[in-house]
């Protein structure tokens, strides 16, 4: 297969011939090992939205989480609705979803996001951004709490009845959002580049609007060229104690460790909020008594997980940021199959995270404990520091920085390979050198205190550094 890329600035054409199947295998192997790269299916991104037939419009890329494809100068403006709050009579045989309440919420939310867009329009730093936002007026209304919603309804995530419920909720959300944007267009005018005929001729519009909404758009146009997206909502959902985005519950519980000054660690089982609520309401003593519809990311078949995202993508004109969490035993071949199934089901993008892979995840289970990290001082009590002898092996590097040469020495245990000490020196005096000496001492004492090198590196990477480095 011939890869082709043209640099707009210079007109330079870059081409490279690759073995497509071999490249796909390499992508799957890398993802299995490190949870990157994710996949974007660009034909689906361009072919399933409100601007498919608008020739002057083109996507320049996506935001980092990939749920919001944007043109050059586009702005990411998102908001999410908690679906679990629309379940009436939760955890009972009479539980039902409040569709009318959702429609009212969507109408208010679309208006609210448009108000935020107006407020922020003059604040964008670049003229290109201000012009793009004014011309296309893209917003991204999404959802969170889906897994909690299904549990309250007594539906099993990924099963046929849950997929059907999501299909109904998704259509109601899309139809209501488009209608709300049309009513805003009536009040304040459509977005600058709005071409009603082109919008109404798109497959996405035809599949997601009622006759009443079609008539509103035909009459008034739309205030926004893009309306719906689904973000991961990791911080929002954690703050609210609900499931994130369209994700299943990651685990029914996690273990919390309390450390004492006497070298004794105590572990507590902490239940996910939705699990805790159900157990209290039904008087359960253990999660083993939970009904079968309490599935988790690690017990769910990945095809069911893809099926859920597929039905939601049918109703989302932007995209969906979503991670398929798979167990540690997941193979490279299964990773390939997952990518292919995602494409076949019409997804715009997908990310795969194998529990226990080399990349440290935000959420983890205990299954990966078999992949032990290298650390010095196995069995140290809390507060103990390992003494280092001369029996070490070392590596020396000289790095060139914006402030001159930096001399680096790392010493390791010759038997285990664990880091023991580091020495950093600028070879000069002054505050920069003093900082490097202090940093190397802190790295050394952390390593000799039993902290593995991956954790040390992760902490330092997250803190940033002087731009000259």
Predicted features, each with a name:
Residues 31-133, 143-153, 242, 247-282, ...:
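Function-dense linear segments that define catalytic or interfacial modules
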Residues 211-219, 364-405:
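Short, Gly/Pro- and small/polar-rich lid/capping loops
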Residues 105-130, 134, 156-233, 320-321, ...:
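Internal maturation/activation junctions in enzymes
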Residues 1-6, 228, 392-401:
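Short acidic-hydrophobic surface loop/beta-edge motif
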Residues 1-57, 80, 88-93, 143-213:
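Conserved, charged catalytic cores of large soluble enzymes
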Residues 60, 66-69, 113, 117-121, ...:
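Catalytic alpha/beta core of large soluble enzyme barrels
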Residues 153-159, 320-322, 346-359, 448-463:
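Glycine-rich phosphate/pyrophosphate-binding loops
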């Amino acid at each position: 297969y011939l890869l082709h890329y043209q640099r707009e600035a210079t007109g330079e054409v870059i081409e490279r011939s690759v073995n497509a199947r071999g490249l796909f295998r390499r992508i799957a192997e890398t993802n299995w090992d490190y949870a990157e790269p994710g996949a974007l299916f660009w034909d689906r991104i361009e072919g399933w939205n409100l601007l498919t037939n608008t020739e002057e419009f083109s996507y320049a890329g996506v935001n980092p989480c990939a749920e919001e494809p944007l043109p050059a100068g586009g702005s990411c403006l998102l908001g999410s609705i908690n679906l679990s709050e629309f379940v009436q009579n939760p955890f009972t045989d009479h539980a039902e979803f409040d569709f009318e309440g959702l429609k009212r919420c969507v109408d208010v939310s679309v208006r609210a996001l448009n108000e935020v867009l107006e407020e922020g329009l003059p604040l964008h730093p670049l003229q290109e951004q201000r012009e793009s936002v004014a011309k296309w007026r893209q917003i991204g209304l999404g959802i969170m709490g889906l897994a909690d919603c299904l549990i309250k309804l007594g539906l099993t995530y990924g099963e046929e009845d849950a997929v059907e419920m999501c299909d109904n909720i998704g259509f109601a959300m899309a139809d209501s959002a488009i209608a709300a944007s049309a009513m805003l267009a009536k009040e304040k005018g459509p977005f600058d580049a709005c071409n009603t005929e082109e919008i109404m001729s798109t497959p996405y519009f035809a599949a997601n609007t009622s006759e009443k909404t079609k008539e509103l758009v035909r009459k008034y146009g739309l205030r926004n060229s893009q309306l719906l997206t689904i973000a991961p909502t990791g911080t929002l959902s954690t703050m609210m104690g609900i499931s994130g985005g369209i994700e299943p519950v990651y685990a029914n519980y996690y273990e919390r460790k309390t450390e004492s000054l006497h070298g004794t660690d105590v572990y507590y089982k902490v239940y996910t909020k939705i699990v805790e609520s159900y157990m209290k309401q039904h008087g359960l003593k253990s999660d083993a008594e939970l009904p079968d519809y309490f599935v988790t990311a690690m017990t769910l078949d990945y095809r069911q997980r893809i099926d859920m995202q597929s039905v939601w993508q049918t109703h989302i004109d932007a995209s969906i940021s979503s991670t398929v969490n798979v167990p540690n035993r997941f193979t490279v071949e299964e990773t390939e199959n997952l990518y292919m199934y995602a494409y076949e089901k019409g997804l715009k993008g997908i990310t795969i995270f194998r529990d226990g892979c080399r990349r440290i995840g935000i959420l983890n289970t205990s299954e990966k404990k078999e992949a032990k990290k290298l650390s010095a001082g196995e069995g140290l009590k809390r507060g103990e520091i390992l003494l280092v002898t001369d029996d070490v092996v070392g590596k020396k590097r000289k790095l060139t920085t914006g402030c001159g040469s930096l001399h680096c020495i790392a010493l390791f245990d010759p038997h285990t390979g664990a880091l023991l000490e580091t020495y950093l020196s600028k070879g000069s005096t002054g505050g920069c050198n003093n900082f490097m000496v202090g940093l190397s001492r802190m790295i050394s004492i952390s390593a000799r205190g039993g902290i593995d090198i991956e954790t040390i590196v992760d902490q330092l990477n997250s803190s940033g550094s002087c731009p000259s480095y």
